[in-house]
């Protein structure tokens, strides 16, 4: 689950109270227990730099490091049907990019206060996930 700009991976529990909300939903029988992984989306090439956030680098980190580590530790079963991804605001951009580039990894998606920018990486001739030429790939991902 990806947070919004200026927040961190702990914002879901400190500000959003996700742990309390999810515990209550489980207790009421509205959802089944699951493991929620929250990563820090404020990823840059160099720590403390004034450079823009690098959503491509975050996507690579999620796919190559975070998901395999979580799979190993919590044994989700390694299947798309056992994984989903969600994001708030800036995290919705990161979620959209990741699910569009890796539809084989996720079966569920949540976009909260979301937006999709065509010019996300400063390339007006590319779509929201960096593909060229621009096409409505973000809509295709929801089919």
Predicted regions and their residues:
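Non-catalytic cap/lid and distal C-terminal segments of serine-dependent acyl enzymes
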Residues: 1-143
């Amino acid at each position: 689950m990806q947070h919004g700009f200026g927040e961190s991976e702990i914002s879901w529990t400190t500000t959003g109270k996700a742990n309390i909300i999810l515990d209550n939903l489980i207790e009421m029988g509205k959802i089944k227990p699951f493991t929620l992984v929250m990563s820090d989306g404020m990823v840059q090439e160099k720590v403390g730099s004034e450079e823009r956030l690098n959503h491509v680098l975050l996507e690579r980190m999620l796919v190559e490091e975070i998901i395999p580590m979580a799979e190993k530790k919590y044994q989700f079963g390694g299947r798309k049907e056992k994984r989903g991804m969600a994001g708030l605001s800036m995290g919705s951009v990161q979620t959209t990019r990741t699910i569009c580039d890796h539809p084989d990894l996720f079966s569920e998606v949540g976009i909260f206060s979301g937006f999709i920018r065509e010019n996300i990486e400063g390339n007006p001739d590319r779509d929201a996930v960096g593909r060229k030429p621009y096409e409505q790939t973000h809509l295709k991902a929801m089919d």
